Swiss-Prot record:
It is found in: Cytoplasm. SUPFAM superfamilies: SurE-like. Its cofactor is a divalent metal cation. The gene is surE. Disulfide bonds: none annotated. This is 5'-nucleotidase SurE.
Length: 263
């Protein structure tokens, strides 16, 4: 008598918060692959990067959608969600962590600010294969194809595995599937967020500030993530937790600083 293979367990998180439509689309798509647990921030946490909450308590709440249990909220950052899920909510490590689907791309230097990418990176730090998904729009979002692609990529990762301390960050154009030109495995580009700071004043005349700006293109190669998505390709970028510049480290050896210490 053969036993049925156990379905994989997938942890779903995001940085847009528990009510984010991309989160709900991603969770629904993952349920076609296995069992799903949703743990997401109680409030939007965009731009929190790898921040975590210290010096104040975290609170976990059960969240219902249409009078049915949907998942858990955590009163903290996306990284807090992963840490709390693995230490207090789940009985065992999941087979996969997926984060998203984010409103707005997380390409190039933008990925450094991203809570969506950070949640996946925390998963990799905790030795769980992890993926991040982002849609290249902030309005009129259609998550249909992004959710479908997320399932395709997740299925392959569940089958093939991932290198340690590495995540995949996928950026998907906000266009119908028929307009997707292909899937490219890209590198992190050099495009970066260029800010403009808006000054305003409260009723007492005290100044306060809003950060604004846009991602400016500094790439011209389909091998770079931002350039690829702007040309309607899905860009999948492997990102490592090791932030060492190994080439420059070798050059530093030639500076001779190590010989200046008198013993």
């Amino acid at each position: 008598m053969t036993t049925k293979p156990q379905k994989p367990h997938i942890l779903v998180c995001n940085d847009d918060g528990i009510e984010g439509l991309g989160l709900h689309a991603l969770a629904a798509s993952m349920k076609k692959l296995g069992s799903v647990t949703v743990v997401a921030p109680a409030e939007p946490q965009s731009g929190k990067s790898h921040g975590m909450t210290l010096g104040e308590p975290l609170r976990i709440r059960r969240y219902q959608k249409n009078n049915r249990f949907f998942g858990y909220t955590v009163s903290g950052t996306p990284v807090d969600c992963i840490k709390v899920a693995l230490s207090h909510i789940l009985d065992a490590k999941p087979d996969l962590i997926v984060s998203g689907i984010n409103y707005g791309s997380n390409t190039a230097m933008n990925s450094l600010y991203s809570g969506t990418v950070a949640a996946a990176r925390e998963g990799a730090i905790q030795n769980v294969p992890s993926l991040a998904f982002s849609l290249t729009t902030y309005e009129n979002a259609d998550f249909t194809y992004a959710a479908k692609f997320a399932r395709q990529l997740a299925r392959e990762v569940l089958r093939r595995g991932m290198p340690p301390d590495t995540i995949l960050s996928a950026n998907i154009p906000n266009v119908p599937e028929k307009e997707i030109r292909g899937i490219l495995f890209t590198r992190q580009g050099r495009s970066r967020w260029e800010e403009s700071t808006i000054e305003r004043h409260d009723m007492y005349g005290n100044p306060y500030y809003w950060l604004a700006g846009s991602l400016q293109l500094h790439d011209n190669d389909l091998a770079e993530d931002e350039y690829a998505v702007r040309h309607n390709y899905v860009a999948v970028t492997p990102i490592t937790c090791d932030m060492t510049d190994h080439r420059f480290r070798s050059e530093l050896e030639t500076w001779g600083l190590q010989n200046t210490i008198k013993k």
